Design a protein with these regions (language model features):
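Helix-to-loop junction immediately C-terminal to a conserved catalytic motif
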Residues: 49
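Conserved ABC transporter NBD signature motif
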Residues: 57-68, 72-73
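Hydrophobic anchor residue at the start of the ABC signature
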Residues: 139, 143
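ABC-family P-loop ATPase nucleotide-binding domains
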Residues: 75, 81-138
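Conserved structural motif at the start of ABC-family nucleotide-binding domains
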Residues: 4, 18-20, 74
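The feature captures the beta-strand-to-loop junction immediately N-terminal to the Walker
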Residues: 31-36
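ABC transporter nucleotide-binding domain
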Residues: 168-253
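Catalytic Walker B motif of ABC-type/P-loop ATPase nucleotide-binding domains
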Residues: 150-154, 159
Length: 282
């Protein structure tokens, strides 16, 4: 079941453009949104949630345009950004009253349960929280108003490896413990996304390169390092992308062509991204 449909999203700035961005999110899936800095991930997420006005295009959430959602329907969307957009002087525990009056579906028991499990001191002010604690606080908010769609923009920034692992487990449980749920998450730490994501969406310079299941990426692509001499003699039809290395070439190819290459390795999502952005075609 498709919970989110983004169709031909366009947004033009002076030095950047989202160009006909289209993809979909299905129930029961976690989508890794991958691209280099400045590729359009944050702009896309803001466009999905109505935080910026689009030049053209449409976004459907739970079957309705984001511009037609009621206040209660909007609560089905949990959106977190890298920074907390709340007054720094407010204490963590006092924010519960604000959220309770803001969200019809606010569950303070869930909220304080997350704060307790995250070891967040509720007597502290927002400005007194570390970057990692702010990241945890952000996700606690998103998971406490009965959202079924999570849009997470670099939510693991500032978390140490143990906390990131806990965070990944939390997101996996969010999908497993409920029906009709989906997650779109961006992160520059692609190895973390590979632990939990079922699918990947690649974006570069404001354009979607590909949307594909992780299993297909894992099982269909290989990377090879060859000498300059070997590169000159390779059948060009068997190369998807290539890039220069020191006195050699790195190659991305289909696994079905592995018999033609020596010392092949499976290409992961990060490899695929690097080849798509920095690599060249023959």
């Amino acid at each position: 079941m498709r919970l989110v449909e983004v169709t031909e999203m366009n947004k033009t700035y002076e030095k950047f453009k989202l160009d006909n961005v289209s993809f979909h999110l299905e129930s029961g899936h976690i989508y890794g949104f991958i691209g280099a800095n400045g590729s359009g991930k944050s702009t896309t997420m803001k466009g999905m949630t109505g935080l910026i006005n689009l030049d053209s295009g449409s976004v459907l959430m739970n079957g309705k345009s984001i511009y037609e959602l009621s206040s209660v329907e909007k609560e089905k969307i949990g959106f977190t950004m890298d920074e907390i957009c709340l007054p720094d002087n407010l204490k963590v525990n006092s924010l519960n009253k604000i959220f309770k009056s803001t969200f019809d579906n606010w569950d303070e028991n869930v909220f304080f349960g997350f704060l307790n499990s995250f070891n967040i001191d509720t007597s502290k002010k927002i400005k007194e929280l570390s970057k990692g604690m702010k990241a945890k606080f952000n996700i606690a908010i998103s998971l406490s108003h009965n959202a079924n769609i999570l849009i997470l923009d670099e939510p693991m920034n500032g978390l140490d490896p143990v906390a990131r692992d806990e965070f990944c487990e939390l997101l996996s449980n969010f999908i497993l413990d409920g029906e009709d749920r989906t997650i779109l998450i961006s992160s520059h730490i692609i190895s973390d996304l590979e632990k939990i994501c079922t699918d990947f969406i690649f974006i570069n310079e404001g354009k979607i390169i590909i949307q594909e299941k992780k299993s297909i990426l894992d099982n269909n692509f290989i990377k090879i390092n060859v000498s300059e001499e070997e590169f000159e003699n390779i059948d060009r039809h068997k190369i998807i992308r290539y890039k220069r290395a020191i006195n050699s070439y790195d190659i991305l190819a289909l696994k079905e062509n592995s018999e033609y290459f020596a010392n092949c390795e499976n290409a992961n999502a990060e490899d695929f991204l690097v080849f798509m952005i920095r690599g060249k075609t023959i």
